[in-house]
Amino acid sequence: MTPDHTLDEFLDLVDENDNVVGKKKRSEVYAEHLSNFRVVNAFVVNSKGEIWIPRRAANKRIFPLCLDMSMGGHVESGENYEDTLKRETQEELNIDTDKAQVRLLGHLSPQKDGVSANMNVYEIKMD
């Protein structure tokens, strides 16, 4: 994260085809229970096929102490999924995605899949 980064960044709002149609602060998106924004999630998998699944911190507002994806983050306004994957993987895991094997597993949407946001899910292979 950059030093001036806040938890109230702007997120792009998207239509049912994942095209940007506007933007709102993250706090407004959650206060209004919107699902038309973008996120990325990734699973780190080693050469044995083992997945690293961390436990969320006790002080997390949503799902404290629950098991989670290896990495997850919001796509900030002006970013695309790949930019966010690179930024969040560096911030959360100190992994440079340019030096890892990354594969898109799929795209999920609130309309088709019942998830909380438009979501790209990735696999990051490394030991």
Where are these regions (language model features)?
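The catalytic Nudix box helix
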Residues: 52-53, 70-104
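Active-site segment of metal-dependent pyrophosphate-handling enzymes
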Residues: 38, 58, 90-127
